[in-house]
Swiss-Prot record:
This is Uncharacterized membrane protein HP_1331. PANTHER family: INNER MEMBRANE PROTEIN YGAZ. Disulfide bonds: none annotated. It is a multi-pass membrane protein. InterPro entries: Brnchd-chn_aa_trnsp_AzlC, Brnchd-chn_aa_trnsp_permease.
């Protein structure tokens, strides 16, 4: 327990930016869900067991349109397909996490993946507990935000337009932090070029997954050149 608390204290400061974003986005999700006639228990269930922001927002649209369960499942898989790329790149770090592994796989969101690649535990801090703490903290923020949003939204109505930009802003900050911490920026520029080209060719609806696959392939094929 002492080792876990040590790792938890080390991990918490790194998650503060996610805390702010997840609370706002979680509250937005909760408010939108109750506006469709669902109560806080549905918001809590989805945030506990689905825990995928984009999928949860898409699910609201599909549920309001009375889409079939099969359609919901297919769209969810397509929207979250990019997580496969994240999981593959984390295999080495997750392989010795023992009982934590199922939860770490479940809690690997875009933002958690970014933090795990940006920060490392201090000397003397267990990496397994550090990774677990970051994942648990981020998940807790999302659950709390969703719950508060659904409870508040049950009694008051809010204009949530523009709130989705919060997560985009967080990603920009995380990218800039990682960029400043490293001297080799080849990977960063490769990712930017691939993303821009894919956006121009495939549009906003399809570019993300294609760009991620191409990035992974490029990193595998040109690993030595990029590390020089």
């Amino acid at each position: 327990m002492h080792e876990f608390l040590k790792a938890f204290k080390d991990a918490f400061p790194h998650t503060i930016s996610i805390l702010l974003g997840y609370l706002l986005m979680g509250m937005t999700f909760g408010m939108l869900l109750v506006q469709q006639g669902y109560d806080y228990k549905v918001a809590l269930f989805m945030s506990l067991f689905i825990y995928a922001g984009a999928v949860q927002f898409v699910a609201i649209t599909l549920l309001s349109a009375q889409a079939s369960l099969m359609n919901v499942v297919i769209v969810s898989l397509l929207v979250n397909a990019r997580q496969t790329c994240y999981a593959l790149s984390m295999l080495d770090r997750f392989k010795n996490t023992k009982w934590r592994l199922p939860y770490l796989a479940h809690a690997l969101t875009d933002e958690t993946f970014a933090l795990l690649n940006l920060y490392a535990p201090k000397e003397g801090v267990s990496e397994k507990d550090f990774i677990f703490s970051i994942s648990l903290l981020n998940h807790s923020y999302w659950i709390f935000g969703s719950l508060v949003g659904s409870l508040v939204g049950s009694h008051f109505s809010f204009d949530t337009q523009g709130m989705e930009f919060v997560m985009t802003a967080i990603f920009i900050v995380l990218f800039m932090e990682q960029y400043k911490r490293t001297t080799n920026h080849k990977n960063a520029w490769l990712g930017i070029v691939i993303a821009v080209v894919c956006l121009a060719l495939f549009g906003t609806e399809y570019f993300l997954l294609i760009a991620l696959v191409l990035m992974v392939l490029a990193l595998m094929l040109f690993r030595k050149q990029l590390e020089c």
